[in-house]
Amino acid sequence: MTTESLETLVEQLSGLTVLELSQLKKMLEEKWDVTAAAPVVAVAGAAAAGDAPASAEPTEFAVILEDVPADKKIGVLKVVREVTGLALKEAKEMTEGLPKTVKEKTSKSDAEDTVKKLQEAGAKAVAKGL
């Protein structure tokens, strides 16, 4: 590939939404038969060596949208758009076919704030440590 075609590719990827990037990641993992997960051996090795406490609290969290009552869907949709920056179509897709991950690799306070906003809008949401 030429430098120009690589720059074009970078520009196209930069225009994707978070949901589209997530779908692209899944498609590439399937196509290349790989996963983008961190190796488990490295984590287990550090814990076995005593470098990390066994009961260490996670520093990164994911916010999971578990349920949206039909009568609360519009309010929840607005909150999803607010916290993710997604367009209306992508936010609507995120509120269907639950559970869905609304945010990944976020701080504990941000995850708690996001869960609180979703719950205030009427959704059932939880923050899970990664």
From Swiss-Prot:
Protein name: Large ribosomal subunit protein bL12
Keyword hit for Ribosomal protein: yes
Any Gene Ontology biological process: translation
Family: Belongs to the bacterial ribosomal protein bL12 family.
PANTHER family given in the database record: 39S RIBOSOMAL PROTEIN L12, LARGE RIBOSOMAL SUBUNIT PROTEIN BL12M
Domain of life, per lineage: Bacteria
GO molecular function, one term: structural constituent of ribosome
Subunit structure as annotated in this protein's UniProt entry: Homodimer. Part of the ribosomal stalk of the 50S ribosomal subunit. Forms a multimeric L10(L12)X complex, where L10 forms an elongated spine to which 2 to 4 L12 dimers bind in a sequential fashion. Binds GTP-bound translation factors.
SUPFAM superfamilies to which the protein is assigned, alphabetical: ClpS-like, Ribosomal protein L7/12, oligomerisation (N-terminal) domain
GO CC aspect terms: cytosolic large ribosomal subunit
Lineage, broadest ranks: Bacteria, Pseudomonadati, Chlamydiota, Chlamydiia, Chlamydiales
UniProt keywords, alphabetically: Ribonucleoprotein, Ribosomal protein
Keyword NADP: no
